[in-house]
Amino acid sequence: PYVTLKWAQNTDGNIHGHISTPLTSMLVHRERARHDAILVGSGTVIADDPSLDNRLYAGSSPLRVVLDRRGRVPAGVRVFRDDNVVYYSEAERADLPSVVKTAVYDSLPGVLSDLYNRGVTSLLVEGGAEILKCFIDSGLYDAVRVEVSPAAVATPPVAPLLPKSPSWIEQLDGNTLYGF
């Protein structure tokens, strides 16, 4: 699939906490509507219990993809609310809702291949920091969208660093958007 990495951070590089504005949140949901699937790691699901759907823009919600190598994500999280989710883990999970599609996690290229075989041609990777760094270090991405807010965030995790310059920069609602 065509892989887009997306995250929001403050000027210190911290990505934890609420960073997006109402307008930039709507743009995130537009990106979700334009992608077949959205991927996050177990840390993001455990910390934020996100819905990973499209509520703020016209269009459908993407397939939700959760990478959880060690089987740490609780069975009652919002991403498991219906059958529009694929869960990758090295651990066996008998406690997940029966609607959740499960697959064995072997590698990022293996996950991308499996998603492609499921009909996914575009994937939005929203984090967290560890997952984003893995995609960057592996070179398994086609585009990157970064939102930077001047607002302070209390603690790490720290956003990954990209080894290239942005192809576009846009000021929007007090935040700066970068495209790579």
Residue positions per predicted region:
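Short Gly/Pro-enriched turn/cap motifs at secondary-structure boundaries
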Residues: H18-I19, V125, W168-Q171
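Helical hairpin unit composed of two closely spaced alpha helices linked by a short loop
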Residues: V120-L123, G127, L132, S138, ...
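Glycine-centered flexibility sites
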Residues: G13, G41, G127-G128, G139, ...
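Active-site ligand-binding patch in enzyme domains
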Residues: Y2-S122, E130-K133
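Conserved histidine-centered catalytic loops in small-molecule metabolism enzymes
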Residues: L108, P156-F180
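Flexible, gly/pro- and Lys/Arg-enriched active-site loops
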Residues: I136-S167
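Beta-strand secondary-structure signal
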Residues: T4, L124, L177-G179
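Active-site lining segments that contact anionic ligands and/or coordinate catalytic metals
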Residues: P62, V120-S122, Y141-A143, N175-L177
